[in-house]
């Protein structure tokens, strides 16, 4: 079973429907106390980094997520949820993140590519990954974002994607912490396989 954290940051229902389609039990809750009974927690998100962190803190999710990871639970961040795992973001000022993955969230610099990135792009694997088990390298996934994650350690990077002249980290996998910048729930069969792989860990 998968616990989906509801902190008012969007795309919850589409993620829940994806798990339902896969026949995987999942619940959506804004009560972090209920998280204790789940080994797998999903942190989705669409919106602004600073506001999201405020919501997580106000609801009690910050301490609950840190405790979940500390106890060996699995955590998957999606889109903004991935960015929140890092140390800080430069989105609309400087904001502190969960610091589960040391690094910084940065804005794409101006280029010939239109920012934000909206649409399908290839994901190239950086290492053998549980999250991408039985998914073909260079598969295409659906992205919607203007900011990207720059991790301090290359060991945390599970996959990269080229956009706006930047070969950025599009997936993280380290010590039970997983994250993807793309939306697996909107990424057809490859995305559904990523969600299934997480649920089956």
Swiss-Prot record:
Gene Ontology cellular component annotations, sorted alphabetically: cytoplasm
Domain Glutamine amidotransferase type-1: 1-201
Documented EC number(s): 4.3.2.10, 3.5.1.2
Catalytic activities: 5-[(5-phospho-1-deoxy-D-ribulos-1-ylimino)methylamino]-1-(5-phospho-beta-D-ribosyl)imidazole-4-carboxamide + L-glutamine = D-erythro-1-(imidazol-4-yl)glycerol 3-phosphate + 5-amino-1-(5-phospho-beta-D-ribosyl)imidazole-4-carboxamide + L-glutamate + H(+); L-glutamine + H2O = L-glutamate + NH4(+)
Record keyword Cytoplasm present: yes
Cell location: Cytoplasm
Pathway(s) this gene product operates in, as recorded in its UniProt entry: Amino-acid biosynthesis; L-histidine biosynthesis; L-histidine from 5-phospho-alpha-D-ribose 1-diphosphate: step 5/9
Key words, A-Z: Amino-acid biosynthesis, Cytoplasm, Glutamine amidotransferase, Histidine biosynthesis, Hydrolase, Lyase
InterPro entries according to UniProt: Class_I_gatase-like, GATASE, Imidazole-glycPsynth_HisH
Biological role stated in the UniProt entry: IGPS catalyzes the conversion of PRFAR and glutamine to IGP, AICAR and glutamate. The HisH subunit catalyzes the hydrolysis of glutamine to glutamate and ammonia as part of the synthesis of IGP and AICAR. The resulting ammonia molecule is channeled to the active site of HisF.
Subunit structure: Heterodimer of HisH and HisF.
PANTHER family: IMIDAZOLE GLYCEROL PHOSPHATE SYNTHASE SUBUNIT HISH
Record's protein name: Imidazole glycerol phosphate synthase subunit HisH
């Amino acid at each position: 079973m998968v616990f989906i954290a509801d902190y008012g940051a969007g795309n919850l229902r589409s993620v829940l429907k994806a798990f339902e389609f896969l026949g995987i039990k999942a619940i959506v809750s804004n009560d972090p106390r209920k998280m204790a009974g789940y080994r797998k927690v999903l942190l989705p998100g669409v919106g602004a980094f600073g506001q999201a962190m405020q919501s997580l803190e106000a609801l009690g999710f910050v301490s609950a997520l840190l405790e979940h990871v500390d106890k060996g639970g699995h955590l998957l961040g999606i889109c903004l949820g991935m960015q929140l795992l890092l140390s800080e973001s430069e989105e609309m000022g400087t904001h502190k993140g969960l610091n589960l993955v040391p690094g910084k969230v940065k804005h794409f610099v101006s280029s010939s590519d239109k920012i934000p990135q909206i649409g399908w792009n290839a994901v190239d694997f950086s290492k053998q990954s549980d999250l991408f088990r039985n998914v073909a390298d260079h598969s295409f996934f659906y992205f919607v974002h203007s900011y990207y994650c720059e991790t301090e350690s290359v060991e945390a990077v599970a996959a990269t994607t080229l956009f706006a002249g930047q070969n950025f980290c599009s997936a993280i996998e380290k010590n039970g912490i997983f994250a993807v910048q793309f939306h697996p729930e909107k990424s057809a069969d490859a995305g559904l396989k990523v969600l299934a792989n997480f649920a089956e860990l």
